[in-house]
Amino acid sequence: MAQNVYGPGVRIGNWNEDVYLEEELMKDFLEKRDKGKLLIQRSRRLKQNLLRPMQLSVTEDGYIHYGDKVMLVNPDDPDTEADVFLRGDLSLCMTPDEIQSHLKDELEVPCGLSAVQAKTPIGRNTFIILSVHRDATGQVLRYGQDFCLGITGGFDNKMLYLSSDHRTLLKSSKRSWLQEVYLTDEVSHVNCWQAAFPDPQLRLEYEGFPVPANAKILINHCHTNRGLAAHRHLFLSTYFGKEAEVVAHTYLDSHRVEKPRNHWMLVTGNPRDASSSMLDLPKPPTEDTRAMEQAMGLDTQ
């Protein structure tokens, strides 16, 4: 069987068929390019939406309100386990499947989640505090109240909800095999979450109090009573690289207190810079630092 190992311009064997084949391939390529169906075009659109800069809500009274745009951040803790591979503050991010994102123009449902070292608000890590039963936009979120966490991912007219459900043999997290956390477009009881005070001895006393912004809290799933947790020691190979796993599981120490894996902050926007968050503000000096500055004559107050 004759085979043309040269280009179509060299007429060897069934050269006429090779020429028509090259023309058909070029027509197919140009048609996909005009319709925006090339893999590189779909990948570019997806990254453009997920990495689109977002603006967080700025709190005036120091509390979280329904309708606020926030980032869910697992704060860094120096006393965590030694086997972690990601240090620093980790923000909760949506993580679409790499293969499915190339096959479709829209986000896949359900969509995965991960924790990333990202302090800048973008489309994949900016969540919206939503009410469950009625429109309560502008009202203060309180401890013990049900709420939903929605995310658009930088897309227009698209809303996915943070959800979780009981673990089964066919449905669990990829690395730890614990209860899975995912994003879905269906509104149901698996979308409901509650904020709890970190100290268990004061938890009941704080029931009904406003949830402070940029402070450590617990986020518990109402249906399964599991806490949102970040696994810094388990990584996932995602569309954007290696990122930490996120599950719904409550970790308790010997004193029956939730571990830092379950600690989260609802981070709001920086009033000085609309494109940044409160994590970018410098921390105030401690009393020891102030005393040292005064002793050295460096007190600027």
Curated annotation (Swiss-Prot):
Q: What is the name of the protein in this document? A: Cilia- and flagella-associated protein 161
Q: Where is the segment annotated Disordered?
A: 269-301
A single GO cellular-component term from the record reads: axonemal microtubule
Tissue-level expression reads: Expressed in airway epithelial cells.
Query: Source gene?
Result: CFAP161
Q: Which residues are in coiled coils? A: none
Does Cytoplasm show up as a keyword for this record? yes
- Oligomeric form and interacting partners: Microtubule inner protein component of sperm flagellar doublet microtubules.
Q: Where in the cell is it found?
A: Cytoplasm, Cytoskeleton, Cilium axoneme; Cytoplasm, Cytoskeleton, Flagellum axoneme
Function, in words: Microtubule inner protein (MIP) part of the dynein-decorated doublet microtubules (DMTs) in cilia axoneme, which is required for motile cilia beating.
Transmembrane annotation, as ranges: none
The UniProt keyword set, sorted, is: Cell projection, Cilium, Cytoplasm, Cytoskeleton, Flagellum
GO biological process terms, semicolon-separated: cilium assembly; flagellated sperm motility
